[in-house]
A protein has these predicted regions:
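Short catalytic/ligand-binding loop motif for oxyanion handling, primarily in non-cytosolic enzymes
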Residues: 28-32, 103-109, 151-155, 191-195, ...
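Acidic, His- and aromatic-enriched active-site or binding-groove loops in soluble protein domains
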Residues: 115-142, 166, 178, 200-274
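Metal-dependent polysaccharide deacetylase catalytic core of the NodB/CE4 family, i.e.
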Residues: 97-187, 284-300, 322, 326
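Aromatic- and acidic-residue-enriched carbohydrate-binding clefts of CAZyme catalytic domains
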Residues: 34-70, 134-150, 225-244, 288
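Catalytic grooves of carbohydrate-active enzymes
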Residues: 249-352
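Sec-dependent, cleavable N-terminal signal peptides
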Residues: 1-12
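N-terminal regions that are enriched for targeting/export leaders
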Residues: 12-132
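Short, surface-exposed basic-aromatic patches at helix termini and helix-loop junctions that form
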Residues: 193-208, 342-352
């Protein structure tokens, strides 16, 4: 994982907090019917042609409402590359890019047909950026693993999850080459420790999780429900086995969805190990969990935001286990899919 050491953190002796982004890109297979004359489902160009010939489904006009939008054309081909090029003077800077398998197929179909402004080598900019390295020798664009069709992993059988991950990894190899990432972004941040043995099996070493799951499992989590608090399942007291953090070490930030996610500082901004123990054999599997902040990720998706919101975390930062603010969100929707985000806010953020 490539990170940016945030200069706004004013602690001395290189005790700054770290920041990074994960930009998630996805479009589904809009009409998964078998393509005429083949054993494969339709991709974007197939569906566009069928709609152009008068077919009424799917409801979405895949040409005009989905792929034929300038910001998406750029996001799916070159804009993450361009954004990171704009901050190349920061030698530790980088981001994670999460590109679904379904989107790869859709864009590949448009590029192969020379349609809607997609090039046959649409993948090249990401491949080039993957070859850039930080001062620590890490790829500046870490193209992370994902369930190929945006499947919600905890609801899959072990066999299905393994196959979704393997075909996604293989598609990344074909487009962007080896080595593939050791990281994983779960669709909709849906994670369960039951998945850990499968992730281990295919050489995934770390996974993103929503950091409110770390906070809500602390024994002194200050639960507030409703519009001023959580909008998720209430914590099970039997799961609250993370250490107490102290009343002054929780931060509750309001976002526009009518809730206020709560984070523990610095606990839910630090990496941890999660484990799964097979109840039949006692075999233990472990994985590193990398927390993404729910409130700050939301804010980064929709507008510029005041980096002073990180002051409380910075004051509690442990230089022996530095805090990481991971801003994980869509890179092709809302404000964070546009030029102003990638080419203005990203360099502005990095310079502060």
């Amino acid at each position: 994982m490539a990170t940016l050491i945030l200069p706004t953190a004013r602690a001395q002796n290189n005790a700054s907090i770290h920041t990074s982004w994960l930009w998630h890109l996805h479009q589904p297979i809009y009409w998964p019917e078998e393509r005429a004359g083949s054993d494969h489902y339709e991709n974007a160009w197939d569906t566009i042609q069928a709609q152009g010939a008068g077919r009424s489904h799917p409801v979405e006009q895949v040409r005009g409402q989905v792929f034929d939008i300038d910001d998406r054309r750029a996001a799916y081909q070159c804009r993450p590359h361009d954004a990171l090029a704009s901050i190349g003077q920061y030698v530790k800077s980088g981001a994670q890019l999460n590109y679904s398998g379904a989107l790869m197929e859709n864009v590949q179909s448009l590029g192969a047909a020379g349609q809607l402004g997609y090039a046959s080598n649409w993948y090249q900019s990401n491949k080039d950026a993957k070859g850039w390295t930080t001062s620590g020798g890490k790829s500046r664009v870490d193209l992370t693993n994902f369930s190929y069709h945006h499947a919600l992993a905890p609801f899959l059988s072990d066999e299905t999850l393994e196959m979704e991950l393997r075909i996604h990894k293989r598609q990344m190899q074909l487009l962007w080459g080896d080595p593939t990432s050791h990281g994983y972004f779960p669709a909709e941040a849906c994670f369960s420790e039951r998945m850990i043995p499968i992730l281990n099996k295919i050489n995934i070493a770390w996974t993103v999780i929503a950091n409110n799951h770390l906070a809500r499992a602390c024994s002194d989590f200050p639960l507030v429900i409703g519009s001023g608090g959580e909008n998720c399942d209430l914590p099970n007291r039997a799961d609250q086995i993370n250490p107490a953090q102290g009343a002054g070490n929780y931060q509750r930030l309001t976002i526009d969805r009518g809730c206020s996610p709560t984070s523990a500082m610095p606990f839910s901004f630090q990496t941890h190990y999660a484990r799964h123990v097979d109840p039949n054999t006692g075999t233990e599997s472990k994985i590193i969990v990398v927390p993404s902040d729910q409130a700050l990720g939301w804010k980064d998706s929709y507008s510029t935001w005041d980096l002073g919101l990180l002051n409380g975390l910075n004051a509690r930062n442990n230089p022996n286990k530095p805090s990481l603010v991971l801003l994980a969100h869509d890179g092709d929707n809302a404000w964070s899919g546009g030029y102003s985000y990638y080419m203005e806010w990203v360099p502005n953020f990095a310079s502060q």
